[in-house]
Amino acid sequence: MRCEVAPVLTGTPLLPATPPGPVLLAYSGGMDSSVLLHLLAARPRYRHAGLRALHVHHGLHADADAWAAHCQRTCDALQVPLQIVRVQVARDSGLGLEAAARNARHAAFAQALIAGEWLALAHHRDDQAETFLLRALRASGPEGLAAMRPQRPFASGTLWRPMLAHARADLLAYAHAHRLRWIDDPSNTDPRHDRNFLRSQVLPLLQQRWPQATDALARSAQLSADASALLLQQDMALLPGVLTASGALDLQALRAQSVERRARLLRAWVSAAHAPPLPAHGVAALEQEIDNHAADRHACFAWQQVEVRRWRQCLFLHRPAAAWPSDWHAQWDGAAPLQLPDGAQLRLLGAPGLRFAQPLLVRARQGGERIVLPQRGHSHQLKHLLQALDLPPWERERLPVLWEGAQVLAAGDCIISGTLDAWLQANAAALQWRTAADAN
């Protein structure tokens, strides 16, 4: 997009002449976001496209109310609508106060963002250099060293950092030239926080020796982003070749890849499923499963409400469903979908108004059930029939069993008795069991 220079100062931050869409500014009241607010408010095109601001009130400082009031006055003066959101920061989350506040803030951003809106953050080049150093000290690979992206999908819109290429000194000069007023949060100078320590102690020392240190670190972040993008293209091209028809990872196909590529394919597979990033110790644990050729292993690695399970020489990614209460049961006539305790659903598909002659009993598997299949004169153990299906064991455990009196009629829609099958065919109907993941 074509850029225009901000008025008054040469070298001040640049904004695209044409807004990418409606903008929601994350406005803390600090110097950085105050400059971005002033720049955006000075652009008629941005106002016309839709411009508003959001201030997150963390309630962690005695002056938090005064900061919110300052933000309101500033936005009123610039005629920019402001939304103030109060959040509860979990002090006992185990993440630390800084990380917990960031999580609460991002949750507020995600909730406030309207579909198609661009969430503008006021990060600059010095922030990028700090992030690069922090990631390097955590032994990050190219994805981590890419630090902050200029833009990326976020919630129902796009996260946007329009000033990422510009130095903090440029922003400060702009703020002084326009006589802006801003908030100085004392927590931003507390050296107990890693980022503040880098900002106040490490980077000034580096810049004494290497005056272009900040520029060089930010450039390294960009080069890492370029490398990461190329690697990701390769990963996504290779990924279909190691997947089964059901989307599981084929261990035999993975073994044909190098160790380094396998690690990347594992992460790409998890990312493609919109699951939380796979941690390094998770990659190591799954690498052991790839190297283990035993056919009967049933290993599992879990993190952040996600699991990778091994079964039949494949790795499956799934989100564990809620357990069924042992005594749960329901009467179901098929007229409406039946919501199951784990979020799954049972449906009777057919003509409008179709229902069973008598309500059926639906409950979880108890063990020992037997069922008479179509065109069979004797019953089979349900357990043995389920084992013969290409259905992972954790899915079998969640199958609802339908009963009519003492007779088992079905296990989900996977196994249907002769009696129920005949009724379904006579009524041009079908039984459908959808897991929580399918239902969503």
Curated annotation (Swiss-Prot):
Catalyses: cytidine(34) in tRNA(Ile2) + L-lysine + ATP = lysidine(34) in tRNA(Ile2) + AMP + diphosphate + H(+)
Spell out the GO cellular component terms annotated for this protein, sorted alphabetically and separated by semicolons.
cytoplasm
Identify the enzyme class: ligase
User: Which residues bind ATP per the record?
Assistant: 28-33
Q: What is its main location?
A: cytoplasm
Q: Which GO terms describe its biological process?
A: tRNA modification
Nucleotide-binding among keywords = yes
Q: Which UniProt keywords apply?
A: ATP-binding, Cytoplasm, Ligase, Nucleotide-binding, tRNA processing
Q: What is its EC number?
A: 6.3.4.19
Q: Kindly list the places in or outside the cell where this protein is found, as annotated in its UniProt entry.
A: Cytoplasm
**GO MF entry, a single one:** ATP binding
The record's listing under Pfam families reads:
ATP_bind_3, TilS, TilS_C
Keyword match tRNA processing: yes
Q: What is known of its domains?
A: The N-terminal region contains the highly conserved SGGXDS motif, predicted to be a P-loop motif involved in ATP binding.
According to its UniProt entry, the function of this protein is described as: Ligates lysine onto the cytidine present at position 34 of the AUA codon-specific tRNA(Ile) that contains the anticodon CAU, in an ATP-dependent manner. Cytidine is converted to lysidine, thus changing the amino acid specificity of the tRNA from methionine to isoleucine.
Assigned protein family: Belongs to the tRNA(Ile)-lysidine synthase family.
Please report the name of this protein according to its UniProt entry. tRNA(Ile)-lysidine synthase
Q: Which organism is it from?
A: Xanthomonas axonopodis pv. citri (strain 306)
